Every structure is written in structure tokens, then in C-alpha cells.
């Protein structure tokens, strides 16, 4: 019969083993470590973590049904990560399930700090947000915050990149936090505002979700990059996220993924590219898409591949922030 001491030892060892990445045990799809910058976590415990799916991509009913039937808990996500050789990744707060209630993400990232690096969602114009960012950086070791939305109907500006959000941006700049941006709608004005914010807040590393949604039909010669996308290459604090969702868009346009990634790498540099699976959101065979992402890097140097799939993300997403920028 197992005594309490033996049970506790077994439980502890099991927890430690579960928290370790697959690089120590199983197969890998690439001969280098992977860092997933775009993982969404949610659970089917609405009594403890209430849903707010009012802005879900496919509607609240479908989102809640999906979360209840197929929760994206650490157990589920880690199993997938281990299958493909992902060492760690960003837990990106999922607007479709919890909006700005980051409770679940912060609870699981506290439990698994070596595998989940939290990126929260907060109201960019709320006066409480600057203080909340400082508190979360210190207490919860967040690496950044994510802002998304459509432009204002009257001004055409994205409010999270205006003076209305100055407090949040200033706090992130002081703390050295990442701001992940996913503007929705017309990309020309959005990318202009991104350039302005990059200049104004040089200690904020801006990460563009889905590389700012290149318009492959509008600008086929530049693989969808508009002049406003291209000019961002001169801003060294802007980074670009190559994701499963973006890969779907590229494939739908009948553009070879390899050609697309090579062009993006040529424009922005591998040291400014990161990669993410979009697990929890994209409804595709993810293991196949991970392999396709890796294969699309064929022809790049090993150093470039490591940068895109691990090194850049590890340098950019710093738990707790990088701190204030020091100038000599």
C-alpha cells in the first residue's frame, strides 16, 4: 500500500516531468528548438473562469461549445508542443473566450513559468491600465500586452495607437514590455500608426500579429506588403509574427509558403521574425502546419531558421519586461 510520503514524491516527480519540454524525450520536427509565440489557452470551467465570448470570431455560442468540448488547457497544449518539439511559448490571452479577464492565463503561467510566457489583453484607454501593467510585470511576469480592434468610424484611427492610449504605451515603454498589435481593417493607415508608435516609444518592442495581414491580391509583387508595411523595416523595434492563420491566407492565395517566408525574411531580417502556431484558434491539422512552416524555411541558413523559430522570440518576450532603456 502506498504511504503518503511515497504518493507525494510520485506526484512531485510527475509534475516536474510534465513541465519539461519534449526536447528531453521525444521527436522533433526540426533540428533546432521551437518557440511558439501564439498559443491560446482556455478551460471548460466556467464557474471558476467565466466566459465572455461576446466578440468571438465565429459567434459566442460556437466558441463556448468549442471551449467546453475541446478546452485548451496546459495538458492539451503541452501534449501538442511535445509532439512537435516546442520548448516553450507565449500564452496569448484569447479575446474570444475571456476578453480582458486574464485570470486563467495568469494562473496557468504561474504554475508553468518555464513553458508559458503570458501576453495579456487590457483596455488600452483605461486609466487603470498603466498601473495594472506595472503590477502584472512584477507579480505575474508578463512579457507584454496585446491590443486589437478596428479603426474609429469618425477619425479612421485605431484608438489603441492614439494619445487616448498614451498611458498604456508609456507604461510599457518604461517597463520594457512587448506590445503585440493586431489591427483589423485597412492596413495602410494601421501601418502608418505602427510606425508612429515605434518612433514615439523606442523601448517598446512591437510585434505585428500575422505580419500585419499582407494583402496578397492588392500587392502581389511584394507578397502583400504595402509601402506602409515596407517602411517599417527601418524601425528596429518592430517584429513580425509568421503564424498558421497567415499561412492559411497565403495558401488560399495560391502563393508558395517558401517564397513568401523568404521574401519576408529578406525584407525584415530573420532576427526580426517570430513564429506561432495559433493553437486554440486555427481549426486546421496543426502538426502538418508546423511541418509546413519549418519546410518553408528551406534554403535559409541554420542561423536564420533558429532566429525565426526560437532565438528572436526568446530575446523579445522577456518575462517581467526588459526594464527601462539605458542611454549613455
How would you name each of these model-derived features?
Residues 28-167, 175:
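Mid-domain alpha/beta scaffold segments of enzyme catalytic cores
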Residues 38, 81, 105, 172, ...:
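Conserved, mostly hydrophobic/aromatic
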Residues 39-41, 93-94, 120-124, 146-149, ...:
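A cross-domain feature marking catalytic cores of carbohydrate-active enzymes
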Residues 4-20, 28-37, 46-83, 87-88, ...:
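Mid-to-C-terminal alpha-helical segments outside catalytic/metal-binding sites
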Residues 143, 158-275, 323-327:
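Catalytic pocket-lining loop regions of alpha/beta-barrel enzymes
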Amino acid at each position: 500500500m502506498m504511504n503518503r510520503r511515497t504518493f507525494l514524491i510520485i506526484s512531485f516527480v510527475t509534475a516536474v516531468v510534465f513541465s519539461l519540454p519534449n526536447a528531453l524525450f521525444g521527436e522533433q520536427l526540426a533540428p533546432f528548438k521551437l518557440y511558439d509565440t501564439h498559443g491560446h489557452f482556455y478551460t471548460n470551467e466556467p464557474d471558476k473562469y467565466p466566459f465572455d465570448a461576446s466578440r468571438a470570431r465565429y459567434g459566442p455560442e460556437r466558441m463556448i461549445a468549442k471551449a467546453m468540448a475541446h478546452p485548451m488547457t496546459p495538458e492539451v497544449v503541452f501534449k501538442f508542443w511535445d509532439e512537435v518539439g516546442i520548448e516553450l511559448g507565449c500564452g496569448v490571452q484569447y479575446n474570444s473566450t475571456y476578453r480582458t479577464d486574464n485570470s486563467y492565463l495568469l494562473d496557468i503561467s504561474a504554475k508553468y513559468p518555464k513553458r508559458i510566457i503570458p501576453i495579456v489583453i487590457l483596455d488600452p484607454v483605461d486609466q487603470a491600465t498603466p498601473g495594472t501593467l506595472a503590477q502584472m510585470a512584477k507579480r505575474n511576469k508578463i512579457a507584454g500586452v496585446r491590443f486589437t480592434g478596428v479603426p474609429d468610424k469618425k477619425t479612421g484611427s485605431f484608438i489603441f495607437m492614439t494619445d487616448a492610449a498614451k498611458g498604456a504605451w508609456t507604461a510599457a515603454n518604461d517597463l520594457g514590455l512587448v506590445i503585440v498589435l493586431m489591427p483589423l481593417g485597412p492596413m495602410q493607415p494601421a501601418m502608418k500608426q505602427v510606425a508612429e508608435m515605434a518612433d514615439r516609444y523606442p523601448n517598446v518592442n512591437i510585434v505585428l500579429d500575422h505580419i500585419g495581414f499582407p494583402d496578397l491580391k492588392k500587392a502581389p509583387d511584394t507578397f502583400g506588403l504595402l509601402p506602409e508595411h515596407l517602411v517599417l523595416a527601418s524601425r528596429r523595434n518592430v517584429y513580425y509574427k509568421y503564424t498558421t492563420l497567415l499561412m492559411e491566407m497565403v495558401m488560399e492565395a495560391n502563393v508558395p509558403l517558401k517564397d513568401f517566408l523568404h521574401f519576408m525574411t529578406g525584407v525584415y531580417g530573420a532576427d526580426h521574425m517570430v513564429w506561432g502556431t495559433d493553437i486554440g484558434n486555427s481549426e486546421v491539422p496543426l502538426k502538418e502546419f508546423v511541418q509546413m512552416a519549418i519546410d518553408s524555411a528551406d534554403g535559409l541558413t541554420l542561423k536564420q531558421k533558429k532566429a525565426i523559430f526560437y532565438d528572436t522570440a526568446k530575446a523579445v518576450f522577456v518575462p517581467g519586461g526588459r526594464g527601462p532603456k539605458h542611454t549613455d
